[in-house]
Regions:
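Extracellular ligand-binding/catalytic regions of CAZymes and related secreted enzymes
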Residues: 91, 115, 197-230
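Short, basic, glycine/proline-bearing loop/turn elements
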Residues: 67-77, 202, 206-207
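A glycine-rich, often tryptophan-bearing local segment used as a flexible ligand/cofactor-contacting loop or short
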Residues: 76, 80-146
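Catalytic beta-strand/loop cores that center a nucleophilic Ser/Cys/Thr
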Residues: 136-200, 205
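Hydrophobic/aromatic beta-strand patches that form the interior of the parallel beta-sheet core
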Residues: 18, 101, 117, 172, ...
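N-terminal beta1-alpha1 cap of cysteine-dependent amidohydrolase-like domains
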Residues: 1-64
Length: 230
């Protein structure tokens, strides 16, 4: 099959971006990611994929896409049980030149224990890490250093990223304990961008939990730009 990510532009089609929506995501998370991808300068054809969507997630569907986004959701073990049959398809998609974009749970799933194994390393729970300043799983705010600047971002039990020694990865943001909070790396011919916090969070995420609103769409755009690079 011809890969849309290789031929779509030449054929005059908008590149296809798939956003998972289903039992391994939480309400509002896929929609926020889809809104981000639709509002950016990338001219993407953004579609939801999942067991109850018009486009079920499959290797054939992924072969037509440029980007696959895994949004926030519930627990890692539960989500992986629902997605493990798609592990090989997702890995092949990225290895062949696709882009993987993971937010919070999507970041955890990019790891290996369990996960899709897309990172030069693994993930761990920030709130249980040494030096963490947040220890609860509830929705809250966290301050990270994003490209050298402190920024306050929506957060809900997101991962930190544990990189292998000499890993080929660009850390975009760090937590206050120095652990990577967002990064971009290569996997085969493709690229992977992941974040523990939620820079894609919309205003209602903050107001629904009584939190001061912080506008972080520029950080989410930076994450997408980083994974879209050649």
């Amino acid at each position: 099959m011809t890969h849309l990510r290789d031929s779509g532009a030449a054929a005059g089609r908008r590149p296809l971006a798939l956003v998972y929506r289903g039992p391994a995501s939480s309400p509002g998370c896929p929609e926020a990611v889809a809104g981000l991808l639709s509002s950016g300068p990338w001219n993407l054809d953004v579609r939801f994929t999942g067991p109850d969507e018009a486009l079920p997630l499959s290797a054939e569907l992924l072969s037509q896409a440029l980007l696959y986004a895994q949004p926030g959701g519930g627990t890692l073990d539960s989500a992986y049980r629902r997605l493990r049959r798609r592990r090989r398809a997702i890995r092949d998609f990225v290895r062949d030149g696709g882009r993987y974009l993971g937010f919070c749970l999507g970041g955890y799933l990019a790891g290996a224990t369990p996960g899709f194994g897309l990172l030069p390393g693994d993930t761990d729970q920030y709130i249980s890490s040494p030096g963490a300043t947040i220890h609860e799983e509830s929705d809250t705010l966290i301050t990270v250093t994003w490209r050298g600047r402190p920024r306050t971002v929506f957060f809900q039990d997101g991962p930190l990223f544990v990189l292998d020694e000499h890993a080929d990865a660009t850390v975009l943001a760090t937590y206050d304990n120095g652990a990577p909070a967002a990064l971009v790396t290569r996997f085969g011919h493709g690229r992977v961008a992941v974040t523990g916090p939620h820079p894609e969070a919309t205003t209602d995420w903050y107001t629904d939990h009584g939190l001061p609103v912080h506008h972080t769409l520029d950080l989410a755009m930076d994450l997408v730009e980083s994974v879209m690079e050649s």
